[in-house]
Amino acid sequence: MSGSTLLKETGPREVFCGLTSIVWLHRRMPDAFFLVVGSRTCAHLIQSAAGVMIFAEPRFGTAILEERDLAGLADAHEELDRVVKSLLKRRPEIRTLFLVGSCPSEVIKIDLSRAAERLSSQFNGQVRILNYSGSGIETTFTQGEDGALKALVPLMPSSQEEQLLLAGTLANPVEDRLKTIFNRLGIQKVESFPPRESTKLPAIGPGTKVLLAQPYLTDTARELKDRGAEILQAPFPLGVEGSQLWIEAAANAFKIKKTLVDATLEPLITRAHKALKPYVEQLSGKKLFLLPESQLEIPLARFLSNECGMKLIEVGVPYLNREMMGPELDLLPQNTRIVEGQHVEKQLDRVREHHPDLVVCGMGLANPLEAEGISTKWSIEMVFSPIHGIDQASDLAELFARPLHRQNLLNKKTLEAV
């Protein structure tokens, strides 16, 4: 692992739960519905995060666990069956129904896998019913997508055909752009997972080479590998450096000539560096502290350090998959401090001690830190923003330059007022 310093920490955490991933997954697969089996708090979280009013009939909902369910006085499975039947009668366009576990449903031991099997047999031919956990008891919010994709892998058809599979949700325009680049390189068969329709799953087999677009798909990658696919080792496509190496990993796997790869990528790289320049001027030399939440922390640290000139104080990660993160770790500066796990109070003490120019953290910590005069960037914004690929490098840098620019404006106004 390069020259980084790895420490482990345990204690109280401050993270969103996996239910949050429903917000981008339901937009990605409009023919799917996500039914959370949880509390009113779960319902409020999803609705608030998605910014969708319930009367707009979004493609997610919550089967509320009442006090009788939590006390074991009611049969939660009977209630769930009733809710599902009512939902499918009212929304016949649903093609895939995900039963999503939550902290409350896991605490009272509702077996959603058994419920999914039972309901699938009842609605066979009409809708596919799957389940996964969105609980935040031991996971971070991005792992919800990992659970959903893992549930879909067994349904993927088998194929011996040689193809490239991009695994992990990408913004549609970004995905289209990346596919165009791969097509120009001569890789004609490029599929995406998850697909834009839940029923149109790509086939998979020994001829499939997988590029992970997101660093939090540990279980999904394992399932794809078990189906015979090859997981390509590469940094993640954040920034120019990571995106170039990511694309080159696929080109090497498909034996594409280096001259063609260079000719295809060099114009994109030149344009991206030009677009990055004004943001590098704002970010260079600034101190950065990343608190653990999204699992994007290491690729972001690599980009902000290597391409934007920021100084890394600490890179916190919820957990570290050394095999998956190996290529990223090799690119980090020497002596980068990486902390796996979280004791939020101790980490906040270190933030205050070093007083960084920018802290990347969860929404729950942002306002208190801002009140102490420390600029922050919400880590959840990285998941909702189109930041992948060479073309998006400047947009990614702008996300981090924006709070620093805002702080400069506020400081100027304060001085003028004085």
Curated annotation (Swiss-Prot):
Keywords: 4Fe-4S, ATP-binding, Chlorophyll biosynthesis, Iron, Iron-sulfur, Metal-binding, Nucleotide-binding, Oxidoreductase, Photosynthesis. GO terms for biological process: light-independent chlorophyll biosynthetic process; photosynthesis, dark reaction. [4Fe-4S] cluster binds at C17, C42, C103. InterPro entries: LIPOR_BchN/ChlN (IPR050293), Nase/OxRdtase_comp1 (IPR000510), Protochl_reductN (IPR005970). Its cofactor is [4Fe-4S] cluster. It catalyses: chlorophyllide a + oxidized 2[4Fe-4S]-[ferredoxin] + 2 ADP + 2 phosphate = protochlorophyllide a + reduced 2[4Fe-4S]-[ferredoxin] + 2 ATP + 2 H2O. Pathway: Porphyrin-containing compound metabolism; chlorophyll biosynthesis (light-independent). Its EC number is 1.3.7.7. Binds 1 [4Fe-4S] cluster per heterodimer. The cluster is bound at the heterodimer interface by residues from both subunits. GO terms for molecular function: 4 iron, 4 sulfur cluster binding; ATP binding; metal ion binding; oxidoreductase activity, acting on iron-sulfur proteins as donors; oxidoreductase activity, acting on the CH-CH group of donors, iron-sulfur protein as acceptor. It is an enzyme of class 1 (oxidoreductase). Belongs to the BchN/ChlN family. Component of the dark-operative protochlorophyllide reductase (DPOR) that uses Mg-ATP and reduced ferredoxin to reduce ring D of protochlorophyllide (Pchlide) to form chlorophyllide a (Chlide). This reaction is light-independent. The NB-protein (ChlN-ChlB) is the catalytic component of the complex. Protochlorophyllide reductase is composed of three subunits; ChlL, ChlN and ChlB. Forms a heterotetramer of two ChlB and two ChlN subunits. This is Light-independent protochlorophyllide reductase subunit N. The gene is chlN.
